[in-house]
Curated annotation (Swiss-Prot):
Its cofactor is a divalent metal cation. HAMAP family: Nudix_RppH. A motif (Nudix box) lies at residues 47-68. The keyword Hydrolase applies. This is RNA pyrophosphohydrolase. The gene is rppH. Belongs to the Nudix hydrolase family. RppH subfamily. One of its GO terms (molecular function) is guanosine-3',5'-bis(diphosphate) 3'-diphosphatase activity.
């Protein structure tokens, strides 16, 4: 059995979707093993990069698969890949125990559509499993307090990097 410390990170993207008022999309997670309590169930869209896919293409795909949103403009990306470890207590169940956490490339995107474009109940034209049960717009600086604690350092970095883009 592979030791936790020797497991690789899953390569992913994260998206800060910013509306015209400078607020950021967050979704309430539909459930899963990452949950630690009912307070920290909100997050921005994120997901894995497929083999041969570049991070920007993955970001657009994941955003559509989780929110149905296609009306976006790229504002910025964080140069570094940000990582977090999942707690050992869930590492054996998350991603079938193959990863110790995630390595993420983060993008800031301007949402250019109308709120009616967002569909978290039947995302991606109804062809994808719902990741969120509801959503809202939130000031970016509030997000680190709404995320599961083990992702908080990543969200703090994202909030710092994208603060001027999101009205902060």
């Amino acid at each position: 059995m592979t030791r936790y410390e020797d497991l690789p990170y899953r390569t992913c993207v994260g998206i800060a979707l910013i509306n015209s008022e400078g607020l950021v999309f967050i979704g309430r997670r539909a459930g899963g093993i990452e949950h630690v309590d009912d307070t920290h169930v909100w997050q921005m869209p994120q997901g894995g990069v497929d083999p041969g896919e570049d991070a920007w293409e993955a970001a657009k795909r994941e955003l559509y698969e989780e929110t149905s949103v296609r009306s976006v403009e790229k504002l910025a990306e964080i140069d570094d890949w940000l990582t977090y470890d999942i707690p050992r207590t869930v590492a054996g169940r998350a991603w079938k125990g193959r990863y110790r956490g995630q390595r993420q490339k983060w993008f800031a995107l301007r949402f250019t559509g109308k709120d009616s474009e967002i569909d978290v109940e039947h995302p991606g034209g109804g062809h994808h499993k719902a990741e969120f049960i509801t959503w809202r717009w939130e000031p970016l600086q509030n997000l680190p307090t709404l995320i599961v604690p083990f992702k908080r350092p990543v969200y703090e970095r994202v909030a710092k990097e994208f603060a001027t883009l999101a009205g902060g």
